[in-house]
Amino acid sequence: GGDGSLTGANRFKGEWSSLVKELLETGKITKEVAEKHSHLNIVGMVGSIDNDFCGTDMTIGTDSALHRIVEVADNIIPTAYSHQRAFVLEVMGRHCGYLALVAGIVTEADFVFAPEWPPEEDWPEKLCKKLELERQSGQRLNIIIVAEGAIDRQGNPITAEGVKKIIVDRLEMDTRTTVLGHIQ
C-alpha cells in the first residue's frame, strides 16, 4: 500500500519496454509477442480508510471504517445518555479528517477536531461553552470526535485524552474516551 506500491508500479511500467526487448533478444518470446505486448497499462485500486487520495470519490475501506465508527457511537450513546456523560471518540485518518467530519455529521456530534481545520486558540473555552449550553438546554449526553492527526494552530496535537482532561477539569463532567484505532 501507499507510495511504495505506486512508485514500484511506475518503475515497472518505465522498465517494461526494456524487459520485453531483453526477452526477445534472449529468444524467450517471438517478435509477434513482443509487438503485441509492447505497451503496459497499470491500473491500481486505492485501499485506504483515510479517503485521502485525489481523483477518487471514496477509497476502498473508507465506507467500512465509517460504518464501524457509527456503530461504536450507536453503542455508546445509550450509556452516555443514561449516565449523562460526555464521550470523546478518537478516530483514525492520519492527516485527513474525512472520517471524523462525516462521523460527526452522522452522529450529531457536539464538536469535531480535524487536522485540516485547526481550531482557534480559544477552542477549549468554545468547547466548554458549547457543552454547557447543550446541557442547559436539556441534552443528557455529548459526543466529541477527534481525528488522530488533529492539531491546534501551533501544530500541537489534540488528543482524546487531552480533550477529556479539559472537559473534566473545567466542567467537572463525567467524561470517557474511546480510541477506535484498528477496529475501524
Curated annotation (Swiss-Prot):
It holds the Pfam family PFK. Gene3D superfamilies: 3.40.50.450, Phosphofructokinase domain. One of its GO terms (biological process) is canonical glycolysis. Substrate binds at residues 48-50, 85, 92-94, 148, 176, 182-184. Catalyzes the phosphorylation of D-fructose 6-phosphate to fructose 1,6-bisphosphate by ATP, the first committing step of glycolysis. This is ATP-dependent 6-phosphofructokinase. Its EC number is 2.7.1.11. The gene is PFK. Pathway: Carbohydrate degradation; glycolysis; D-glyceraldehyde 3-phosphate and glycerone phosphate from D-glucose: step 3/4. Residues 1-184 are annotated as: N-terminal catalytic PFK domain 1. Homotetramer. GO terms for molecular function: 6-phosphofructokinase activity; AMP binding; ATP binding; fructose-6-phosphate binding; identical protein binding; metal ion binding; monosaccharide binding. Its main location: cytoplasm. It catalyses: beta-D-fructose 6-phosphate + ATP = beta-D-fructose 1,6-bisphosphate + ADP + H(+). It is found in: Cytoplasm. Keywords: Allosteric enzyme, ATP-binding, Cytoplasm, Glycolysis, Kinase, Magnesium, Metal-binding, Nucleotide-binding, Transferase. SUPFAM superfamilies: Phosphofructokinase. Belongs to the phosphofructokinase type A (PFKA) family. ATP-dependent PFK group I subfamily. Eukaryotic two domain clade 'E' sub-subfamily. GO terms for cellular component: 6-phosphofructokinase complex. Disulfide bonds: none annotated. Mg(2+) binds at residue 3. Allosterically activated by ADP, AMP, or fructose 2,6-bisphosphate, and allosterically inhibited by ATP or citrate. Its cofactor is Mg(2+).
